[in-house]
Regions:
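Active-site neighborhoods and metal-handling regions in enzymes and metal-associated proteins
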Residues: 1-119
Length: 119
């Protein structure tokens, strides 16, 4: 079942990533985002592979909100959300950048273009 488990984990992680990308997070706390992502992974039949990372602005990666984290997303923020789903120990890891400040549009697009070129 190894390949099937990887594929299922990847499908779940991808679905959750796309839902996260489309959602409006302005006004949400980082802890609320983490709770949402974790519940979406579990709802689809997987477990979280690691704590959800929610990194705001200059924080490059791997910030994990504490349960009572009061940091809130504003309309001028750039947030990176890193998530992982696991099925029977087989992990899919993915991330998405959500941008609310037009001055960062070209940066986000350049990163997306680099990712697509690498794949």
């Amino acid at each position: 079942m190894q390949i099937e488990d990887y594929l299922k984990a990847g499908k779940i992680a991808g679905e959750v990533r796309e839902n996260v990308r489309k959602k409006d997070w302005i006004g949400s706390t980082l802890a609320e985002i983490c709770e949402y992502v974790e519940s979406e992974i579990i709802k689809r039949g997987a477990k979280c592979a690691f704590p959800v990372n929610t990194s705001l602005n200059e924080v490059a990666a791997h910030y994990t909100a504490e349960p009572n984290d009061s940091k809130t997303v504003s309309d001028s923020d750039l947030i990176k959300i890193d998530l992982g789903a696991q099925i029977n120990g087989y992990i899919a890891d993915t991330a998405v950048t959500v941008n609310y400040d037009p001055q960062y549009d070209s940066l986000v697009q350049a990163a997306e273009n680099a990712l697509q070129a690498a794949m």
